[in-house]
Amino acid sequence: MSIVCLESLTFGLGHLVRAADALGERLTLLTRDRSYYTYELDRLPADALDVVETETFDVDGLTALLERSPRPRGLISSTDTWTLVAAELAERLGLPGLDPAVLRLTRDKSAVRRRLYEAGLTRGRAVPVTGAGPETAEAILKEPGLPAVLKDTAGTGSQNVWLVRDPAELDAVLAEAAGREFRGRLFAEPYFAGPVYSAETLGWDGRTRLLGVSSRLMSPEPYFREEITAFPVAFPEPRRAALERWLGDVLAAVGYTDRFAHVEFVLTADGPEVVEINPRIGGALVGEGLCRALGVNVYEALVEAALGRRPALMDAEPPGGPAVAFVLGYPAAPGVFTGVAGLERLAGLPGSPAWYPVRAPGDLVEHLADSRGYAGIVYAEGDTAELATHHAVAAANALRVLTEPAGPTSAPGPVPVLGPAPDPAPAPGAAGEGGGGGADGG
């Protein structure tokens, strides 16, 4: 093994294998369950990489495994869940890697907000939420005020995020949150209104390069469920350059100045505001879109960075390719996923649309207000991101995600791919924020 990948995103493993091969390296995937990567593994030769099933949260066990000969030359981690495990593992093995303290900071959303506020890069502060009573509600009404977002400091996959627009919603959300388990702690911050985007950046030695910006079309309030993504957004050059400078300042403020970053932000009437900083390449089909739209295998930069080398992509001018877009396919009712109707129609539609499955028949779909609920992704291309979006939406509209009741009280149904998320809980505003595919945040 020369390059080790500690788990991976649902999509992109094939690109990573080909990137390692192009650079003369052999990829080994460490995973708790190889079946999670069935889609990608089925499309690779059997000997394309080594797959080792092991407990990937056990740092001691992983260290012992990787200290055996031959030792790896680099370690890749592209998921939120294993970010800190990978950082500790790289440190133990003496491999090129990022400062674990920086990665811990990026995984704490309230700490990121505080750091950006201190640097003058956000107008809002993070306020801890320590209870559910009237005194807590009163404190939130004072700061950050309404509308506000309440969320988990270490949340992922769009879970445990609430939009609060009035005092009644605040009381309901505090009551609901009191019964939830959090990966971190609950905090409040201002709700920044405006279109949502994600910046796909690559950094090295303090310089940040903006590879492009993805649009994020969201479900109606109070939900934060992602519906459609397109890349690259066609910003006028002065605005693109200003965004690149701002992103460089944002990432420098948290000390994350090397490797890929996926920065979600809102373009408010008063300028950009960070939603969250992800120290990795984007999930879902963002990596696929980068490869196709830029005309290069961006995963070579992942391998080069893991080896401690300046990625060639920092200085290259990619040849370019088609713009891309994808639609997340959600059921409108929970239940057992049974398949997708209409896939045979995709071949006759413009934009070379394709269905990328995330769930297998028999999987239970329980949560529809965040990214846990989608069954797959409809991908399409176009001459511009706008045209690619039209193609992807037309293809998604030709499909029906099929579910059947999981129990006697469940609603059956063929259901539309698109549409607002139903309210899954008594409290208004229960929602996810951000999202991604597979392990994007998983």
What are these regions (language model features)?
Residues 129, 161-166, 202-204, 268:
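Short beta-strand-to-turn element immediately C-terminal to the catalytic PLP-Schiff-base lysine
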Residues 303-442:
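Peripheral (often C-terminal) accessory segments that flank ATP-dependent C-N-forming ligase machineries
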Residues 1-102, 359-364, 369-373, 381-400, ...:
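ATP-binding N-terminal substructure of ATP-dependent carboxylate-amine bond-forming enzymes
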Residues 91-160:
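A conserved helix-loop-beta module that forms one wall/lid of the active-site cleft
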Residues 49-57, 126-132, 164:
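Short acidic-hydrophobic, aromatic-tinged amphipathic segments that line or gate anion-handling sites
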Residues 190-256, 260, 267, 274, ...:
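ATP-dependent carboxylate/phosphate-activation module, predominantly the ATP-grasp catalytic core
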Residues 122-124, 147-150, 161-198, 213-214, ...:
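Conserved ATP-binding module of the ATP-grasp superfamily
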